[in-house]
């Protein structure tokens, strides 16, 4: 899980163990089922950064609707003194045989739709390394078992245990081995579950004098 969290922090860079459950093989009759393989389906980032030059706020969502495409949509606001610049975007990027194609549903600055020149400048920042950074988190999976353990699909793998609290709809995942290395101090992370266990949500928040940061990751059982 620690490795997964590190990977997801790059997703917005373009702009600028459980107890045993009774229903281990399905989700019939609305029973709670937290056994299976989960993969990332959505990353949402809300951040505000401040420095001597001004303040920037970003609200951005990244999804991977197909194995060869990612979608990024949201807003960016920059405040410099009395000047405020607002950007809105919604773009789907598809990996093709010869590179990448861009389908812009929206690219507005201060409410004005941008032309091909502005879009091209954004597209020129995108390369194979950027694609790998964006898609790597979506390739990771987490498999939970009925005996209260989990492991991911990295090599070397991370693994640990998990417990569930049905009263609060929370799952606590404990990392015992991180990338093949046994941790002296296990790391615990809390996730919320919904849809009878089909969806897991992890929220990470940070706050300092330089701004705030919140990342919400949605994992869906395959």
Residue ranges and their predicted role:
Residues 24-40:
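N-terminal helix-cap/turn-to-beta initiation motif at the start of protein domains
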Residues 1-10:
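Bacterial N-terminal signal peptides that target proteins for export
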Residues 18-22:
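C-terminal motif of bacterial Sec signal peptides marking the signal peptidase cleavage site
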Residues 37-82, 95:
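Post-signal-peptide N-terminal segment of Sec-exported extracytoplasmic proteins
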Residues 46-50, 76-197, 201-203, 213:
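Contiguous, well-ordered beta-strand patches that form the walls/edges
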Residues 11-15:
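Repetitive helical segments and hydrophobic/amphipathic motifs
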Residues 214-222:
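Short, low-complexity, Pro/Ser/Thr/Gly-rich segments in the mature regions of secreted, periplasmic
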């Amino acid at each position: 899980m620690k490795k997964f969290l590190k990977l997801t922090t790059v997703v917005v860079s373009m702009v600028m163990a459980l107890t045993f459950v009774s229903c281990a093989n399905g989700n019939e009759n609305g029973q709670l089922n937290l056994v299976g393989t989960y993969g990332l389906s959505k990353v949402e980032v809300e951040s505000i950064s401040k420095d001597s030059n001004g303040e920037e706020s970003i609200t951005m969502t990244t999804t991977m609707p197909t194995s060869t495409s990612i979608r990024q949509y949201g807003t960016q606001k920059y405040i410099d003194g009395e000047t405020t610049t607002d950007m809105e975007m919604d773009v789907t990027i598809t990996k093709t045989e010869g590179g990448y194609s861009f389908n812009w549903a929206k690219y507005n600055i201060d409410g004005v739709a941008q032309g091909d020149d502005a879009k091209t400048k954004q597209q020129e920042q995108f390369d194979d390394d950027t694609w790998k950074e964006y898609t790597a988190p979506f390739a990771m999976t987490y498999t939970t078992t009925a005996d209260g353990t989990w492991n991911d699909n990295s090599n070397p793998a991370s693994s640990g245990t998990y417990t569930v609290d049905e009263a609060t709809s929370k799952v606590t995942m404990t990392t015992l081995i991180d990338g093949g290395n046994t941790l002296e101090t296990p790391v615990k992370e809390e996730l919320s579950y919904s849809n009878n266990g089909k969806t897991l949500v992890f929220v990470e928040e940070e706050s300092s004098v330089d701004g705030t940061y919140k990342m919400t990751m949605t994992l869906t059982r395959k």
